[in-house]
């Protein structure tokens, strides 16, 4: 039994040719017999399937005398040498290419983990790592790295032609050392990028137009509000001026009525001097004959001047009134009260209505047309 085991080990360490392995196939009984011998000689604690070489009929010592003779002449080797024996068998396998690894990886992943663990011992750790790497990286396609010159030429062509015909695409691909598919894909991506850029610009322009319209509307509304506010201020100012004017007239009439009864020729308190009053004072120096009459006229005219009245527009200039005499003043007083000349020494009785009429007649004089 030991002799057979030694001859078996010697055959395992030997290197049979590939033709012998392929031409001679054992019967089913021999295969099971050799596997049972191998498993009986090994330790019964671990059940290891027979290696790939034991499935070949050359395990029988009497089948090939040349192999048995070679096995008898080789030195004995330890069982540790049988563990490293699959390495030369792996060297006989054809080289593996990346596309072959991808297919193998797909098949290996389909197998359950238990079957993979009980597989032949010739698959080492390195091979499993290579299969894992090939399965992980083979599914992803690498991006094309274009050079600066290629990108420049492609951008130039895209500037003139957004779409390429096939002859031009083939020409550019040959010129730039690219494939036709790469040129086609680049133009597709560039067209999509151009479309996104134009859409973004249109959106920005539309938003800017809406903002400008809103700003213009706000400005117009502000201007309208300002104009309305100014109009309201002007109207309120005009109303205040009219109220102040009527209040001054009423105050003057109330002060002049008792002074007329007392016969006093006192001056009345008037608002600050205007340009018309200054002209009246200058006019007093030219006609010193009637100082009292002109002073009363100036004060009354300054107090009740209203250039907007229709009487003021119809009155001629004051060139005809450069010289006033006492007779004219007396005539005016006679028109107001016929009993005034006869009762000069007595207090004059002038009603409020007659005084208002007197002030209205004086306001008709247009003092702005005075010519000096």
Curated annotation (Swiss-Prot):
MF terms per GO, please?
DNA-binding transcription factor activity; DNA-binding transcription factor activity, RNA polymerase II-specific; DNA-binding transcription repressor activity, RNA polymerase II-specific; RNA polymerase II cis-regulatory region sequence-specific DNA binding; sequence-specific DNA binding; sequence-specific double-stranded DNA binding
Source taxon at top rank: Eukaryota
Q: Could you tell me where this protein is found in the cell?
A: Nucleus
Q: What Gene Ontology terms for biological process does this UniProt record contain?
A: anterior/posterior pattern specification; brain segmentation; cell fate commitment; cell fate determination; cellular response to retinoic acid; dorsal/ventral pattern formation; embryonic skeletal system development; embryonic skeletal system morphogenesis
Q: What SMART domains does the record point to?
A: HOX (SM00389)
The record's DNA-binding region positions are 139-198
- Offer one Pfam family short name for this entry: Homeodomain
Cystine pairings recorded for this chain: none
The record places the motif (Antp-type hexapeptide) at: 96-101
Q: Where is this region: Disordered?
A: 42-96, 194-225
Keyword terms, alphabetized: Developmental protein, DNA-binding, Homeobox, Nucleus, Transcription, Transcription regulation
Its GO CC terms are: nucleus
Q: Which family does it belong to?
A: Belongs to the Antp homeobox family. Proboscipedia subfamily.
This chain's function reads:
Sequence-specific transcription factor which is part of a developmental regulatory system that provides cells with specific positional identities on the anterior-posterior axis.
Tell me the protein's name: Homeobox protein Hox-A2
Which organism does this sequence originate in? Rattus norvegicus (Rat)
Q: Lineage in the entry?
A: Eukaryota, Metazoa, Chordata, Craniata, Vertebrata
């Amino acid at each position: 039994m030991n002799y057979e085991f030694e001859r078996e080990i010697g055959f395992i360490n030997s290197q049979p040719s590939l033709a012998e392995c392929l031409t001679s196939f054992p019967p089913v009984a021999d295969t099971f017999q050799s596997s049972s011998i191998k498993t009986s000689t090994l330790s019964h604690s671990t059940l290891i399937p027979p290696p790939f070489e034991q499935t070949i009929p050359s395990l029988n010592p009497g089948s090939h005398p040349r192999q048995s003779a070679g096995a008898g002449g080789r030195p004995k080797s330890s069982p540790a040498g049988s563990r490293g024996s699959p390495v030369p068998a792996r060297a006989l396998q054809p080289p593996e290419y990346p596309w072959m690894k991808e297919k193998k990886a797909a098949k290996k992943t389909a197998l359950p983990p238990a079957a993979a663990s009980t597989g032949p011992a010739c698959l080492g750790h390195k091979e499993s790592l290579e299969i894992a790497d090939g399965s992980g990286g083979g599914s992803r396609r690498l991006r094309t790295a274009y050079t600066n010159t290629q990108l420049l030429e492609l951008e130039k062509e895209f500037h003139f032609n957004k779409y390429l015909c096939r002859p031009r695409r083939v020409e550019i691909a040959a010129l730039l050392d690219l494939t036709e598919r790469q040129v086609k894909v680049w133009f597709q991506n560039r067209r999509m990028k151009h479309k996104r850029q134009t859409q973004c610009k249109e959106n920005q322009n539309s938003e800017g137009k809406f903002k400008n319209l809103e700003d213009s509307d706000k400005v117009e509304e502000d201007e309208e509000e300002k104009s309305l506010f100014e109009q309201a201020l002007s109207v309120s100012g005009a109303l205040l001026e009219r109220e102040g004017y009527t209040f001054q007239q009423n105050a003057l009439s109330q002060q002049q009525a008792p002074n007329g009864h007392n016969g006093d020729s006192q001056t009345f308190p008037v608002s600050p001097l205007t340009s018309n009053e200054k002209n009246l004072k200058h006019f007093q120096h030219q006609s010193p004959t009637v100082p009292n009459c002109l002073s009363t006229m100036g004060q009354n005219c300054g107090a009740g001047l209203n250039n907007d009245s229709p009487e003021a527009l119809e009155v001629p200039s004051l060139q005809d009134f450069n010289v006033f005499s006492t007779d004219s003043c007396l005539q005016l007083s006679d028109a107001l009260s016929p009993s005034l000349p006869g009762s000069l020494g007595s207090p004059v009785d002038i009603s409020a209505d007659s005084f208002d009429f007197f002030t209205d007649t004086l306001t008709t004089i247009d003092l702005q047309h005075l010519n000096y």
